[in-house]
Design a protein with these regions (language model features):
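N-terminal cap/lid segment of alpha/beta-hydrolase-fold proteins
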Residues: 1-27
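Glycine-rich phosphate-binding loops of nucleotide-dependent enzymes
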Residues: 5, 33, 53, 102-104, ...
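Conserved dinucleotide-binding and phosphotransfer motif residues
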Residues: 11-13, 53, 93-94, 120
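Conserved alpha/beta-hydrolase
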Residues: 49-69
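Primarily recognizes the serine-hydrolase "nucleophile elbow" in alpha/beta-hydrolase
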Residues: 86-129
Length: 129
């Protein structure tokens, strides 16, 4: 999978992700993972498999983890929701993404975050948690 390193912000913090764009305006998926997970671990594996199946994927480090800014190793549930909304914004605003076909996939603890984000962000059209 060929992914581009991207940066975006949430609450003034810089977040870092890996964006793999599929051809032809394919649906897009943002992935969120386990408690202390980073984009190179389980969410990166899921992203690679989904991209192989023709989806645009964004795996990113939440605030305080991996390459992203913020207080190190601090679990901030409201902050993670803001991070997800910002990630959805990045996807929805990308010229090669159909903003009406953005989904969220949450793995482990990320499942709860994905469902909560989808409940409050109408740009998320499908969710797997």
């Amino acid at each position: 999978m060929s992914a581009e390193r991207v940066t975006f912000t949430a609450d003034g913090l810089t977040l870092v992700g890996n964006l793999a764009v599929a051809a032809g305006g394919a649906p897009a998926v943002v992935l969120t993972g386990p408690f202390t997970g980073v984009k190179e671990q389980v969410v990166g594996t899921y992203a690679a498999r989904l991209h192989e199946r023709g989806l645009t994927t964004l795996a990113f480090d939440h605030r305080g983890f991996g390459e992203s800014g913020g207080r190190r190793a601090h679990e901030d549930s409201q902050g993670k929701l803001a991070d997800l909304r910002a990630a959805v914004g990045l996807l929805a605003g990308h010229p090669d993404v159909d903003a009406g076909r953005v989904a969220a996939v949450g793995i482990c603890l990320g499942g709860g975050y994905a469902v909560r984000a989808a409940a409050t962000d109408p740009r998320i059209r499908a969710v797997v948690g």
